[in-house]
């Protein structure tokens, strides 16, 4: 029986990178972000370390790509949920859906379960990517950085210190977020 070569046909580099990222996602979800190991990844993908480095980069690039793919899925779900909404209704929906999607995503769960008090996680609040996505998803005007930063911090706070149940959280978001963005 002949085994098919997953690197034959099409764009080999893209095929290899996608396979590497999928395996890295599984390993990271299982073992944690800091436990990503190139040898284990190469074994999982059935390729050499050189193929990993050539097609996907080092650990940092692979972790970034895995997180980017996870974020893209979350962003698409939020974007779909807020389509056609505006103002405070859009912002409340965006926050609620983002919280639900991050919590249901294995990498989202992992990221927030490993954050401990006192750690420097300013990259979450200062990231231009996070700022751009928050601006876009919430329908805010470009340049309203204070509103964007506040929304990002609200979401992070609710992820880090969750409310007892979803209904209470939804009431809190509606009660305190909606008036802040009422026209």
Label each region the model flagged.
Residues 45-56:
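Short hydrophobic/aromatic patch on the recognition helix
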Residues 19, 40, 69, 89-97, ...:
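Amphipathic alpha-helical interaction segments
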Residues 61, 65-68, 78-104:
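Hydrophobic alpha-helical connector segments
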Residues 1-44, 61-64, 69:
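Basic, helix-initiating cap at the start of DNA-binding domains
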Residues 23-30, 73, 77-84, 154-162:
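Solvent-exposed, amphipathic alpha-helical segments
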